[in-house]
Design a protein with these regions (language model features):
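C-terminal glycine/acidic-rich active-site capping loop/insertion
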Residues: 1-25, 47, 52-131, 135
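C-terminal/domain-terminus segments
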Residues: 41, 127-135, 160-164
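C-terminal hydrophobic helical "lid"/dimerization subdomain
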Residues: 138-149
Length: 164
């Protein structure tokens, strides 16, 4: 079973999902999405685990990325540091420690969309990796449809390739 749907206080509304994934590469993953987990305050958290280390980012501490190596070392990267991405002007409209994030994320997205429109107008296609199109949206819906089917039958469900 690759999906667990929890109870809701509202009829016919899914507001708590735990999804397990197995990729063809052998990597395993999980998603927990909930609108009913009291106290989390839309607490987006992304964690990646591997055999050489792990990384953790938490929405409530948006300026910090924690890296953990298999020798026990913990490295903390912050927005004010001299890292390749964190130090980019795109992510530093304000100095480290000043509130930033939500509005800036949308500003970056709108800027990326505008650039993609210009590229598309000039070349008939765009190369911006941050602007998704119809095919990406359909693949995401396909994932959730397979998860619902998995929940219904109580077994793993293979994602079918999406052909455009």
């Amino acid at each position: 079973k690759s999906l667990s749907i929890g109870p809701s206080v509202f009829l016919n509304l899914v507001d708590d999902i735990l999804m397990w994934l197995k990729f063809s590469s052998g990597i395993k993953g999980s998603f927990w999405m909930s609108k009913s987990a009291l106290g989390n305050r839309n607490g987006l958290q992304i964690s990646l685990y591997g055999d050489k280390g792990s990384a953790n980012w938490i929405q409530t501490e948006p300026e910090i990325l924690k890296l953990f190596s298999n020798d026990g070392t913990c490295t903390i990267l912050d927005r004010g540091g001299r890292t390749k991405v964190c130090g980019s002007p795109r992510y530093n409209r304000y100095k480290a420690g000043h509130p930033a994030g939500f509005l800036e994320a949308f500003a970056n997205l709108y800027s990326d969309i505008a650039d993609a429109f210009i590229q598309f107008d000039e070349a008939g296609a765009h190369q911006n990796p941050y602007v998704f199109g119809f095919d990406h949206s359909v693949k995401g819906l396909n994932l959730f449809a397979a998860a619902c089917k998995s929940n219904e039958y109580g077994s793993w469900e293979e994602l079918k390739p999406v052909v455009f």
